[in-house]
């Protein structure tokens, strides 16, 4: 017995030494990460508490080992475009020296592109801990001016920040389909000094070159951010981007004016603050590209994104040729709330600017047309095809992603599939849909009472009635005029509308864009809810033969 015990004690180090090494490594990682991001950085987030970091480190080590074994046994290669970065270890140490502050300064590196190693600068990217507190970090690459990466100089390689992984990637793809200005995006596999870093989302950093690639005139791109370190910039502290132009800066500059020039933005903010005035709304119709803003709002509804809010994620281009503002999609995090139980909203009103626009008839018409066109032209089905393809690709990739977060491939796959179901549900129009013709079949959108050569028209719902067709008792040879009367906050308004004949003069067609009475109920944190009451119009047809009736 003593002999056996001696042998066990003699060889016990074979078991205890690896356990001690692994235990020591995990303990060091836990203490270091907790001290860096919870104690020194002061994140005060539940995820950065010691017990949660301990669970993360253990799960990450298990997943790292499993991913490499899976890749070796199955000989599984990535189906995504590989991005190879080479950064000297000394430069990586500089980035890591005093996180997170040290990570925000560029270090030199190289990038393999088209078979050549090209000089680049590399840093970590993001204002909040989920971008760089974990092993899979978000990175920004900046190329030389003479050596762009496929027409882009600043490239973000973003670590997915949610269990479902694909929120921003699919949001940007949807924006492109809808014709909304957005950065280029792609799913890629990142390799750093030859080591696999897993799946990242490539997102173009919005700069002047974004405009050039979209065939737009170079001009100012205003950036609205008062979150993270941007809370301490000029004009701060404040809880709204729409109180002062001082809290905005530019990521692209019209070189015909000083960089500090922001007169168009000042005008926009003043109009937002006076949005209850009809004159302010008229000016907004002039300085806002309403087709683009209507499409942007439709995009927010289809992604259920309230991430462009009162304090961050604003990118607005001012077109110097047309003197109009155009929205740019940025970090929208589509379907994030729906994945966590939020109910579908037909309208997303998450800030003062959108609250202002929802009081503008031209905007309402443009938004409705964007939604109608999206479904009528089959873009919804085209997008669902993109969703399915992206999810198939991710299911192939996560098994070998060494830094997958959360570090549970089967769990991530289930969440990705759930995201597909959520997107399908939103596009199918849960709870009534986006357009009235997707709603209850017995709902009455418009009704009219006729009186000889005039009518009283009532419009319900939240979308315009664009066309009226009036059948006549007699054919007309000379086109009459339509005079429309309605009540506004300042009193009765009168508008003349053009009239066209159809059916060889037996019918009249009026293109009016008649709206219900829409108001925005202001809620918490500058958000709003669209309320609808019937819109009432009196339409008089002038110039008809006295014997002709509607």
How would you describe each model-predicted region?
Residues 140-142, 156-158, 189, 198-202, ...:
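Structural recognition of the beta-strand scaffold that forms the well-ordered cores
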Residues 154, 180-191, 280-284, 314, ...:
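Surface-exposed patches in mature extracellular/periplasmic domains of secreted proteins
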Residues 2-116, 381-550:
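Regulatory N- and C-terminal appendages and interdomain linkers associated
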Residues 103-161:
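Conserved oxyanion/phosphate-binding beta-strand-loop segments in alpha/beta enzyme cores
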Residues 259-266, 270-309, 316, 323-463:
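Middle-to-C-terminal accessory/interaction subdomains
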Residues 96-98, 123, 152, 200, ...:
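Short, solvent-exposed loop/turn and secondary-structure capping segments
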Residues 180-183, 195-295, 391-394:
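Internal "kinase-insert"/substrate-recognition segments embedded within catalytic cores
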Residues 160-195:
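A conserved helix-loop-beta module that forms one wall/lid of the active-site cleft
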């Amino acid at each position: 017995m003593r002999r056996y015990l001696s042998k066990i004690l003699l060889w016990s180090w074979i078991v205890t030494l690896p356990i001690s090494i692994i235990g020591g490594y995990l303990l060091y990682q836990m203490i270091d990460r907790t001290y860096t991001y919870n104690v020194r950085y002061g994140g005060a987030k539940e995820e950065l508490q010691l017990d949660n970091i301990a669970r993360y480190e253990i799960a990450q080590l298990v997943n790292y080992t499993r991913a490499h074994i899976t890749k070796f046994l199955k000989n599984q290669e990535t189906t995504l475009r590989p991005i190879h970065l080479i950064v000297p270890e000394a430069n990586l140490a500089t980035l890591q020296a005093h996180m997170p502050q040290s990570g925000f300064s560029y270090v030199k590196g190289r990038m393999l592109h088209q078979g050549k190693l090209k000089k680049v600068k590399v840093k970590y990217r993001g204002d909040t801990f989920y971008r760089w507190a974990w092993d899979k970090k978000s990175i920004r690459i900046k190329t030389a001016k003479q050596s762009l990466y496929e027409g882009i100089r600043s490239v973000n390689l973003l670590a997915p920040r949610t269990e479902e992984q694909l929120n921003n990637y699919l949001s940007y793809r949807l924006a492109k389909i809808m014709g909304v200005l957005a950065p280029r995006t792609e799913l890629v596999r990142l390799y750093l000094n030859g080591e696999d870093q897993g799946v990242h989302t490539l997102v173009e950093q919005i700069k002047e070159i974004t405009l050039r690639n979209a065939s737009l005139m170079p001009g100012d791109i205003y950036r609205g951010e008062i979150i993270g370190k941007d809370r301490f910039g000029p004009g701060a502290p404040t809880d709204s981007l729409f109180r002062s132009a001082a809290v905005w800066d530019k990521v692209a500059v019209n070189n015909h004016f000083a960089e500090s020039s922001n007169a168009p933005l000042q005008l926009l903010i003043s109009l937002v603050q006076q949005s209850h005035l009809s004159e302010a709304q008229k000016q907004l119709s002039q300085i806002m590209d309403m087709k683009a803003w209507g499409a942007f709002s439709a995009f927010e509804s289809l992604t259920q994104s309230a991430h462009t809010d009162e304090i961050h994620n604003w990118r607005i281009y001012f077109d110097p040729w047309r003197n109009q503002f155009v929205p740019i999609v940025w970090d929208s995090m589509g379907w994030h709330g729906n994945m966590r139980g939020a109910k579908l909203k037909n309208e997303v009103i998450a800030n003062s600017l959108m609250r202002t626009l929802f009081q503008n008839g031209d905007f309402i018409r443009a938004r409705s047309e964007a939604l109608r066109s999206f479904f009528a032209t089959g873009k919804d089905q085209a997008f669902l095809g993109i969703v399915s393809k992206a999810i198939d690709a991710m299911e192939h990739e996560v098994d070998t992603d060494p830094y997958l977060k959360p570090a549970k491939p089967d769990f991530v796959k289930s969440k990705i599939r759930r995201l597909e179901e959520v997107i399908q549900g939103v596009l199918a129009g849960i709870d009534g849909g986006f357009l009235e013709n997707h709603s209850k079949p017995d709902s009455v959108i418009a009704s009219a009472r006729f009186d000889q050569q005039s009518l009283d028209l009532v419009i319900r719902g939240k979308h315009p009635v664009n066309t009226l067709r009036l059948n006549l008792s007699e054919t007309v040879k000379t086109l009459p005029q339509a005079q429309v009367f309605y009540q506004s906050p300042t009193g009765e308004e009168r508008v003349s509308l053009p009239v066209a004949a159809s059916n060889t003069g037996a019918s009249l067609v009026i293109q009016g864009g008649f709206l219900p009475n829409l108001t925005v109920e202001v809620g918490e944190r500058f958000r709003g809810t669209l309320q609808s009451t019937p819109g009432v119009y009196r339409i008089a047809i002038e110039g008809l033969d006295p014997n002709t009736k509607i």
